[in-house]
Swiss-Prot record:
<dbReference type="GO" id="GO:0005576">
    <property type="term" value="C:extracellular region"/>
</dbReference>
<keyword id="KW-0295">Fungicide</keyword>
<keyword id="KW-0964">Secreted</keyword>
<dbReference type="GO" id="GO:0042742">
    <property type="term" value="P:defense response to bacterium"/>
</dbReference>
<dbReference type="GO" id="GO:0031640">
    <property type="term" value="P:killing of cells of another organism"/>
</dbReference>
<keyword id="KW-0044">Antibiotic</keyword>
<dbReference type="GO" id="GO:0050832">
    <property type="term" value="P:defense response to fungus"/>
</dbReference>
<protein>
    <recommendedName>
        <fullName>Magainin-B2</fullName>
    </recommendedName>
</protein>
<keyword id="KW-0929">Antimicrobial</keyword>
<comment type="function">
    <text>Has antimicrobial activity against Gram-negative bacterium E.coli ATCC 25922 (MIC=50 uM) and against fungus C.albicans ATCC 90028 (MIC=100 uM). Has no hemolytic activity against human erythrocytes even at high concentrations.</text>
</comment>
<comment type="similarity">
    <text>Belongs to the gastrin/cholecystokinin family. Magainin subfamily.</text>
</comment>
Length: 23
């Protein structure tokens, strides 16, 4: 469902932001 999609998107977003912050 949409909740599962949002959860996956949230995890991906956090990982992406983490990499951006490290740069």
């Amino acid at each position: 469902g949409i909740g599962k999609f949002l959860h996956s998107a949230g995890k991906f977003g956090k990982a992406f932001l983490g990499e951006v912050m490290k740069s």
